[in-house]
């Protein structure tokens, strides 16, 4: 038995996701939040929580099912799709950084833009893709997960945020990673899977064609995870105490 790990588990509780009031969901691309956390978003919105979506890249290279729409036109289309999807889930505050899809940006620019948004929105918990899942290899997902983790850690330190990013600090209390293979917190989302599917397959139609093998495979995968977790979505959650100098918290 790892005594240090047990002591941390007892002394520093993993926050419950529903306990907060202000949420920032960060997506590398326009459809990632819906895939990784769409049912949870719908539940939180129905509870009256304040939710902001932040989409980091323009998605211009996600053209595998876009019927020939490419480049700037696809980037604009994906914005429209994202706004439609967010509204279906109950989210009105949607923001776009407009960074070039596929890692075509400077990482420090992403970091600064995240700091600016976190300072402005002042979320209590930040959601981002798990960049440490092992198999994840997309540069945008790796960059966004890492940057979100850094800002979640730095945000409560007013002087640090001002000195490095020229913004105010924020009252971030936790980070939650979606698309993770290591969940330690679960949100009951019974009855919300179809709404999550609609937010993906009826809104992001440039990415998912009805009846296409890729769409059917994604639906099946999401159903398996949903039932595997007992009609819940799973996340890897750390409080601000877990984020620094406590390796056993992992």
Q: What do these predicted regions represent?
A:
Residues 2-24, 105-250:
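Metal-dependent de-N-acetylase/amidase catalytic core
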Residues 1-121, 245-248:
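Active-site rim/loop-helix segments in enzyme catalytic domains that contact anionic ligands
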